[in-house]
A protein has these predicted regions:
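N-terminal Rossmann NAD(P)H-binding glycine-rich loop of SDR-like oxidoreductase domains
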Residues: 3-21
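Active-site Tyr-X1-5-Lys
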Residues: 121-147
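SDR active-site strand-loop-helix element
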Residues: 6, 53-57, 98-104, 148-150
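NAD(P)-dependent short-chain dehydrogenase/reductase
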Residues: 130, 144-147, 151-182
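Rossmann-fold NAD(P)-dependent oxidoreductase module
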Residues: 15, 19, 87, 135
């Protein structure tokens, strides 16, 4: 089975690609260049050759959110997803599965929520996640769609925890990680 992955060079994408390849799947990374305006035909060819497409593309939220960077966060998620969905919807053969990332930032900042709550927050991140999911939902109704709402990635070798540990090592700033029972 061939699986195309946008965001394959990111932290989650690298680990997922390695895992899938270890299970014998043929992973096709969809690099940034494929999402340039003049590369749509090539993107379509890549998507056409796969049974599954996984969309993990998106600039890191672990930077200062200037207005320019907010636009980059938006473009790297919404524009990429829009192009992927367009490529999926123009396929000659139905795609089996489209998995598209989102984030728990979709929910309001306070309260307890799970995947059955349709209560979207009002801040920038919630609006971004909502727009991201709406783009993915424009996928043809005959394609199985899964939207995953990721939390903050915590790992010593990448993700947010690596940066937190670096700050703790080189400054007097300390981060206390809860036990998960808060």
């Amino acid at each position: 089975m061939r699986i195309a992955i946008s965001g394959a060079s990111g932290y989650i994408g690298q680990h997922l690609s390695s895992f899938l390849e270890g299970k014998g799947y043929d992973v096709i990374p969809l690099g940034r260049d494929l999402f340039k305006e003049d590369c749509f035909d090539e993107l379509c060819r890549c998507v056409e050759s796969c049974e599954v497409v996984i969309n993990l593309a998106g600039a890191s939220i672990n930077k200062r959110w200037t207005e320019a960077y907010k636009q980059e966060l938006y473009d790297s998620r919404i524009c990429v997803t829009r192009q992927l969905v367009h490529a999926i919807n123009t396929r000659s053969v139905k795609l089996e599965l489209f998995i598209s990332a989102s984030a728990v930032g979709y929910y309001p900042a306070f309260g307890e929520y799970d995947e059955y709550h349709d209560c979207r927050g009002m801040d920038f991140l919630a609006r971004l996640c909502g727009a991201w999911e709406e783009e993915a939902s424009a996928c043809s109704s005959d394609v199985s769609l899964v939207i995953t709402r990721f939390g903050v990635v915590l790992s010593e070798d990448g993700g947010a925890l690596k940066e937190m540990l670096r700050l703790q090592r080189f400054s007097r700033v300390s981060v206390v990680i809860g036990n998960g029972q808060q």
